[in-house]
Amino acid sequence: MADLIDLLHVGRRRVIATYLLAGDEPALVDCGPSSCLGALEEALRERGLEIEDLRHLVLTHIHLDHAGAAGTLVRRNPSLQVHVSAIGAPHLVDPSRLERSARRLYGEDFDRLWGELAPVPEASVRPVGERVLELEAFPTPGHASHHVSFLTAGGACFAGDA
């Protein structure tokens, strides 16, 4: 079952969230930005978990509000596998272009809004196929060309920004 975690972006509720998929191999669907790591850590602890307990990070797309903390999470937990579309994967491995364009857009507010944007080691990246864990994956381009949505066996959909 998926457990919604509000990441309290810049102290505001209902702006950015992640879903925790509990079980033998705990997973997050999207992770939010590094600026929200404190809220994520607190919510995981309330559920008896630490970042180091996570095994999978399933990303709908690479925008900062959905995937900005991916590299920081992998640095803290090198066994974390990051599932992302093949189109989005290179931007996680080398986020320099993504960061450059975001810094132009957000200016001096970038660090406060998004925090660190660390690279994800290529060895930690798993391109999304037809299935990720128990989720059916399917492309949902529009908001982003690399956007992927995930459907549970029970019919719930993790749609990101689709």
For the regions a protein language model found, what residue spans apply to each?
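Core dinuclear metal-dependent hydrolase active-site scaffold
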Residues: 20-21, 129-152
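Short histidine/acidic/glycine/proline-rich micro-motifs that form metal-
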Residues: 27, 87-91
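Active-site neighborhood of phospho(di)ester-bond hydrolases with catalytic His/Asp-centered motifs
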Residues: 29-32, 54-61, 83-85, 140-142, ...
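Active-site environment of divalent metal-dependent phosphoester hydrolases
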Residues: 36, 62-67, 90-91, 144-147
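Metallo-beta-lactamase
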Residues: 90-138
